[in-house]
Every structure is written in C-alpha cells, then in structure tokens.
C-alpha cells in the first residue's frame, strides 16, 4: 500500500524490540498519520592510518568484537576533505552504543579516527535517506496494529522501505494553537515552587479563543485544562512567546509538584527539553516565537508587540504591567487582566501565523525540524545543511569540536562623507562573500600549501586554493545561490498577496539566511569544517572587491559616499548607476543591485551610523541610539524626531526648537512615565557584578524583594531625585512616581546627548544646548 504524507516531525523510538524512526505527518486529505520505519541500522566509520591493512582490521573486528553491540563490518570508499580513502563501516544493533563502540575500536585497533559515531540516530537516518521536514514523501507499507487513537492520529503505518521525496509544493492546512500563561505572586516574580498558574489564554486556527482559569490556590485544573485543549483540538503547531524559557519549564515544574499529568504531545506525554534548549512535544512542532525574534535584528526589545509591529500584523499593547498582575487578579479588575491575556494570545497567534512559512522553509532547507530550527543558532542550521550535502558527496562527516579561534581581519568599512546628502542610492552586492568563495573555489578541501599552475593565491593573505575540482563550499554555495535566484524569479512572476508568492518569498529569505551564514560558519568555533584560512581568505577577497569597486565607480564619475562590508552608498545618477552595475558584472563577475534609494541621508563621523529619509517618508535609522535597547524611549524618540526634522528641512532650525520645547514639557512633567524607563540587559547574575551600575543595583533590589532576575533579563529603571551616585538614584520603574523623577538627569543625560549626536554634524554641540549653570539653555 502506498502512502503519501507531508512530514512535520520525527523522533527515535523503540518498536517491537527494535530501534525505529517515527515520522509524524499529514496526508493530502488532511489526515494525521504516524509512519514507523524500523528498517535502518545505525553505523559509524573507522578511518585506518596510512599503511594499515584494512582487510586485517575488518577480520580483527569481526573476530574480537571490541564492543558487544557490533553486528557486521563492510569496507567502503569515502572522502576525507576530497581525498578518497578506504574506511570500515561498523553496523551496531544498539544506536545508543555507537560512541562507546567507536571509542573501543579506536583504542584497540590504533586507527586514525572514528566518524559519525556522535550523531543522533534520528539525524543519521535523515542524512542517510535525505529526509527533510516540511516536505512531501511517498512510502510503501501496511497499516499497523498499533491503535491510532493512542497517538492522536487517524492511521499508523509500518513501512517496508524508506520514504522517498515527491514533488509537491505547498504544505497541507495545519492546525495552529497559541497560548500564554499567567502565574502571580504577592511578592515579586512568581516561583513555580510556590505560585500556581492562575490563567492560560489560547487561540486556535479554527477562530476559537478562550481562557482556562482557576479560583483555587492550586493549578491542577489549569494543567488539566491545557492538556485537554491539546488533546481535543490536536494542534500540529503550538506557538508561544518565551515558551522555552518560561511557560513550559514553569508548567512542567508545577505538574511535577502537584502530581498532575501534563499531556501535550501526541503520545499524551509532557513537553520534554531537547536540543538547543527547546522543548519538544512529540508529534507536534513547539515554535517559540521569541526564538524567531532573534532573527529580527531591527527589533531591539523583544516583545511580541514589538515583533508584531515590525511584521505589520495586528497586536494589542498591554496596559497592565507584570508588576500589577497580583493587584488585578485579587482586586476588582480581574477582567481587564483576563482580556489582556486573551489579546496577548491572539498577538502570539498572529505573529506565529505570519512567521510560519519562513519557519517551514528554513526547516526544510536546514533539515532541522520546525521546533528546533528557530531555537538553533545560525551556525547549527548551516551545520545541519552541510552534513546532508557532504554525505551526498561521499564525504566523511567530522565531529564538531570547540576550538581556540585565532582572530582575523574582517570586512572593510569606509569612512563616511559626513553631513547631509540628497538622492543617495545603496548598491548591494548579491551574496558577495558566498559568490567569491564559489568563484575562487575557497573551501577547506581545496586549501593547499603552495602555489602552482592550477592554484589561486588570495591577495593580501597569501593562502592558496586549488581551482579544480570544486570543493565542498563551492558545490553547496552554488546550489544555494541558484535556489535563491530561482525563488526570486518565481516570486517576481507570481501575483503579490497570493499564497504561492508568500511561500516563494519565505523560501528566498530562508535560502539567503543559510547562504550568507555559510561564510561565517567557516570561522565559527563549533564548525565541523572549520578553517581560519577559508574565513580569512573570504574576508580578504571581500575587501579587495570593495576597493576595486570604488576605483571603478570613480573612473565612471560616480561619487562614493560610504561603504560597508558588501554595500556602497553613491550619489544617485540613474545612467551612471546602470553603467556601474554592468561594469561590475563585466570586470568582477559579480552581481550588484540597486537597493534602497534615499531622498536624503545623514552620515555622522562614526562608521555604521547613519539615517536616511526614504521616498515614502519613512525614516531608516542604522547604528544610532534610536534603534538600540539601552536608552530610554524618550531619548530614542528625541533622536528619531530630530533626525526626521533635519532630513526633511536640510537644516537644524526646527529640530533645535523641538528639543527646547520638549525640555519644557519634561520639566512640567508632561511626558508619560513609560518613556522615562531605561532598559538594560543583565549579562551576569546580579551577585556576580563587581561594578555598581544602575541596572545591576535595581536588579539586586528586586531580587531582595522576591523578584526573579537572571542572566538575559532586561531590567527597567528610572533615575530619581534621591541623593547619591547614579546607581543609588536608580529605582525599579514600577515603584517610581512622577514626583520622584530626576528631570535634570533626563534633560542632561538623555535628551541633550541624543539630540546633540545628530545636531553636532551642523556644528551644534551639547554645550550649545546646555547653559553654564549645567541647565539646558532655553
């Protein structure tokens, strides 16, 4: 019997006494299925030393069995950095014993190394048969005697071979669920040891939303209610925002303490912590959108509301601060808190729905399941992709080792032409570093010791790379670049707003992420194919390319105002820009495209800091405090408005007037308190700091009062009129009234510096805004 299904998730389980892979999928008629493949035997490789007799090694292993799990041995030809070698392929009846078995073999046989013994059984299965999540497959098999109701599926199949990919583009209609929990404490942050969950708000893709609440000082009803939501609606994808760091750990601890079963997986099991710190729900994809926000570099303060605003999806702003939850829950205004949490669950759902296509495309490309791919650092995404591709090329997959990295010179950044400039175009090289690695065959397996007839020498650093045959990086990057270009072409031909267009744009973005990250992967400490020479050579070629491009632009009469890594900012002249693009292709063999066009742009003296006004009137701010997370909203708003005014007017008059008027409003307490809050992130536990910084002191105060503050938390504080040093004047934002605010501090240390960083380009310094008494000149 043939079965076609779309793969959502997979895991390693025992089935009838054998190791098996369980594949969770959806059929073309929207049925949920569990496909069991018990036909894969785990193995690892042994690489003999030069001169060792491989046949004798094989006989010895078969005779002496260095580890009892070894079942059989075969000799194969594989590649080690493109060089063909004979290896021993050792099959084991116990997947969990691979590493021990390999260690004993290396010890007893004295071979050079073992390979692929540290890879998980499920990952080896994916690599062996090229199984990627979020793709359609076909398999032959029979219906299993396993009761499908036990696993919340419509049918269970046992297959005779292995799944094979079939060309089918779109994912099936998935069932989506979002949720958010509330736990409250009368003193500080809630603790799962002490404080029960009082409320769960949820929304699903059928359009239903509600809450589960508990009046008791216990949360058995809440945990049981959340379990029933998962069992009844049976979601494929579960969205949260911070679920991996807060919701799931809290729920699991509460379930254990109350001895209440948390049944959220398709196996009716709990959430289980897995790779990359994420929590796995068997047969479902647990997608934490806080991880997704990590890919949105322009969103500095990671809240679901900020992410929703960036994506342009609907979200409500919370009116009730977390510090006020207890008062609302125990007082007469509980309904407002319940309403806010329902709105938050809806916001999480909207963000998740918008992010889903990108998540599925990134999962398919990297081969990491949807619940892992966002939690994984970009290096691990590339790692997973490269393992799959290396196996197809017959390469042995080396173990990942943490290395001591030797720093190397990075990308070139030009000195900006300070001041205002009209009609400025940004010219972006398309995948410049990957393209250079392809062009010059830069790869760990093409690196050679000396120059030769068929060898390329990298300028400046002097490393040598073989021109032929293509290396690992050239092969995989060529495929990625071609795939991205194909998605881009198809998207251009597809009507905007259609489902197909959105999927193609998501595929293009996912491919771009993996392509650009591959260059950095070469110099990443956790890389399986680490090579400082590769990373250093790619950076050197990038610098050489930018310098040649600048010379070419100047020869055409095109004025270059700034350059950063793989982009040039030029005075826009349509004819000259068009000619320049053609000359780059002709002379350098690279693609450069017209990117952003600014009506007017302001460059400061610092590199990587500028702001531009676009044709639609939108302000684009890069590298300045306006988009950083360590100033108050007041300072960011001041700088944004000053930038907007000087860019609109091409002079500082109106901007300076705006600053003086704002200072009057501040001194009259006419600004909202939230705009005065300064947020800083803890990089250590509060007790580990040796300095007395304001956010550290506030964190210590909060900890003493029962609030949970730890590494990675953002601490919000306001500077008050209290005497003492700055750190002594800082108080938690929720404990400060407007009468306690030190307005002089905000004038002299927030408004004036934020404005002066822009206005100093026009010769207006802080001293021109501040009088001799230390107060601002009005």
Task: List each language-model region with its residue ranges.
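Conserved RNase H-like, two-metal-ion catalytic cores of nucleic-acid enzymes
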Residues: 2-64, 152-239, 253
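Active-site-proximal helix-loop-helix substrate-binding element of RNase H-like nuclease domains
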Residues: 210-213, 234, 238, 248-251, ...
């Amino acid at each position: 019997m043939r079965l076609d299904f779309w793969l959502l998730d997979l895991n390693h389980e025992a089935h009838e006494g054998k190791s098996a892979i369980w594949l969770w999928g959806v059929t073309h008629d929207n049925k949920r299925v569990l496909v069991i493949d018990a036909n894969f035997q785990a193995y690892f490789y042994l690489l003999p030393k030069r001169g060792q007799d491989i046949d004798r090694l094989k006989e010895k292993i078969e005779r002496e069995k260095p580890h009892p799990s070894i079942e059989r041995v075969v000799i194969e030809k594989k590649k080690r950095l493109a060089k063909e070698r004979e290896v021993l392929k050792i099959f084991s009846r116990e997947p969990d014993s691979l590493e021990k078995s390999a260690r004993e073999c290396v010890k007893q046989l004295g071979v050079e190394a073992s390979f692929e013994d540290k890879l998980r059984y499920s990952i080896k299965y994916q690599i062996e048969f090229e199984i990627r999540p979020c793709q359609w497959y076909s398999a032959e098999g029979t219906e299993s005697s396993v009761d499908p109701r036990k696993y919340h599926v419509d049918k269970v199949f046992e297959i005779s071979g292995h799944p094979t990919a079939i060309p089918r583009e779109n994912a099936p209609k998935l069932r989506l669920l979002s949720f958010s929990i509330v736990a409250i404490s009368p003193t500080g942050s809630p603790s799962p040891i002490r404080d029960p969950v009082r409320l769960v708000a949820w929304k699903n893709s059928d359009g239903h939303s509600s809450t589960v609440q508990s009046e008791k000082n216990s949360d058995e009803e809440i945990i049981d209610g959340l379990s029933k939501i998962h069992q009844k609606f049976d979601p494929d994808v579960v969205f949260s925002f911070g679920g991996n760091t807060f919701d799931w750990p809290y729920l699991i601890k509460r379930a254990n303490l109350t001895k209440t079963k948390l049944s959220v997986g398709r196996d009716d099991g709990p959430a289980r912590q897995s790779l990359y710190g994420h929590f796995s729900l068997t047969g479902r994809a647990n997608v934490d959108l806080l991880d997704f926000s990590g890919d949105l570099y322009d969103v500095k303060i990671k809240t679901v509301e900020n992410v929703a605003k960036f994506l342009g999806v609907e979200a409500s702003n919370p009116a009730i601060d977390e510090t006020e939850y207890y008062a609302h829950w125990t007082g007469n205004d509980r309904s407002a808190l319940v309403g806010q949490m329902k709105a938050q669950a809806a916001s999480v759902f909207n963000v998740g729905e918008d992010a889903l296509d990108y998540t599925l495309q990134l999962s398919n490309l990297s081969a990491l399941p949807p619940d892992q791919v966002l939690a994984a650092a970009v290096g691990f995404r590339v790692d997973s992709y490269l393992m799959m591709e290396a196996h197809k090329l017959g390469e042995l997959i080396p173990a990942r080792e943490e290395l001591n990295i030797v720093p190397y010179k990075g990308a070139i950044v030009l000195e900006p032409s300070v001041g205002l400039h009209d009609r400025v175009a940004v010219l972006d090289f398309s995948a410049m570093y990957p393209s250079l690695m392809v062009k010059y065959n830069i790869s760990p397996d093409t690196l050679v010791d000396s120059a030769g007839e068929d060898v390329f020498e990298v300028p400046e650093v002097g490393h040598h790379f073989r021109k032929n045959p293509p290396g690992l990086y050239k092969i995989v990057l060529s495929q990625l670049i071609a795939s991205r270009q194909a998605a881009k072409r198809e998207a251009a031909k597809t009507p905007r707003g259609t489902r197909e267009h959105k999927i193609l744009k998501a595929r293009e973005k996912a491919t771009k992420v993996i392509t650009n990250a591959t260059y950095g992967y070469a110099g990443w400490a956790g890389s399986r194919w680490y090579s400082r020479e590769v990373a250093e050579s790619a950076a050197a070629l990038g610098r050489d390319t930018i310098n040649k491009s600048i010379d070419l632009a100047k020869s055409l009469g095109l004025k270059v105002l700034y350059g950063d890594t793989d982009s040039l900012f030029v005075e826009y002249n349509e004819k000259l820009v068009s000619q320049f693009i053609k000359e780059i292709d002709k002379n350098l063999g690279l693609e450069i495209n017209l990117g952003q066009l600014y009506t007017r742009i302001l460059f400061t003296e610092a590199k990587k800091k500028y702001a531009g006004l676009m044709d639609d009137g939108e302000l684009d701010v890069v590298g300045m405090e306006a988009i950083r997370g360590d100033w108050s909203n007041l300072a960011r708003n001041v700088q944004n408005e000053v930038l907007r005014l000087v860019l609109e007017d091409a002079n500082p008059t109106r901007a300076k007037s705006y600053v003086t008027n704002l200072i009057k409003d501040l001194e009259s307490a006419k600004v909202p308190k939230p705009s005065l809050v300064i947020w800083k992130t803890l990089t250590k536990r509060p007790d580990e700091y040796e300095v007395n910084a304001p956010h550290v002191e506030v964190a210590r105060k909060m900890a003493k009062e029962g609030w949970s503050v730890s590494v990675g938390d953002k601490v919000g504080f306001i500077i008050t009129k209290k005497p003492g040093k700055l750190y002594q004047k800082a108080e938690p934002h929720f404990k400060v009234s407007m009468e306690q605010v030190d307005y002089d501090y905000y004038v002299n240390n927030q408004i004036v510096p934020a404005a002066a960083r822009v206005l100093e380009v026009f010769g207006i310094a802080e001293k021109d805004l501040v009088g001799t008494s230390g107060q601002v000149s009005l």
